[in-house]
Amino acid sequence: NMLAHLEDGALNGDTLTPDRKHLLEAQRNRAHSPEMPMHLGPQFVYQWQSNQNAAMSAMPNLQSRLSSLSHISLNLDHPEGRSGSASGSAANLAGSNTHASSVREYRCEYCGKQFGMSWNLKTHLRVHTGEKPFACRLCVAMFKQKAHLLKHLCSVHRNVITTTNGADTENRYSCCFCSMCFESVQELVRHLSGHHNNLLLTKNL
């Protein structure tokens, strides 16, 4: 090439001193020799190390940014799943709150006890007020609950509601308000609760 030609001309010229020719020839041989290591100046080595250290220090930040971008891309791949799960969780939470409020929405103003049905609260309030709306028409007994009155009729006044069926020894249970008879106490209780429910209340005495 041209550089080699110029170097040959410079070496063959008469203007160079023998020492200068020897130095140029040694440099040319070193440049073309594959086994000779390349020597870098200290300023170039320091600059190269500084650039390498800066690149290595920036590597963790780059990796963290790449990981965050991959997380975002994964979420964007399934937007309907993410929104669906969020809406599902919100719906479940709202449903549980609604269920809890519907189960315990009646509170006693005296003790704070809660009930799921209004009639349960109404029955409970009689514990505080002392109200006894159910009365026995065969005596002066009064009760807070209708079940207690029916139990009273079938136990205290059992001889009144129990009759003997002719020659048979089987007992039949007659209604104290009408002439109907029943084969069991349970049937009589259902009859009293249905047909004569108003007659069991004290306000109708």
Swiss-Prot record:
UniProt GO BP: female analia development; female genitalia development; male analia development; male genitalia development; negative regulation of receptor signaling pathway via JAK-STAT; regulation of transcription by RNA polymerase II
Query: What cellular component GO annotations does this protein have?
Result: nucleus
Keyword Zinc-finger assigned: yes
Q: Where in the cell is it found?
A: Nucleus
Gene Ontology molecular function, alphabetical:
DNA-binding transcription factor activity; RNA polymerase II cis-regulatory region sequence-specific DNA binding; zinc ion binding
What InterPro entries does this protein map onto? Dev/Hematopoietic_TF (IPR051497), Znf_C2H2_sf (IPR036236), Znf_C2H2_type (IPR013087)
Give the signal peptide as a residue range, or say none if absent: none
- This protein's source sits in the domain of life called Eukaryota
C2H2-type ZnF: 106-128, 134-157, 173-196
Q: Which SUPFAM superfamilies match?
A: beta-beta-alpha zinc fingers (SSF57667)
Which key words are in the record? DNA-binding, Metal-binding, Nucleus, Repeat, Transcription, Transcription regulation, Zinc, Zinc-finger
Q: Does the keyword Cell inner membrane apply?
A: no
Q: What does this protein do?
A: Probable transcription factor, which is required for terminalia development.
Write the protein's name.
Answer: Probable transcription factor Ken
This protein's species is Drosophila yakuba (Fruit fly)
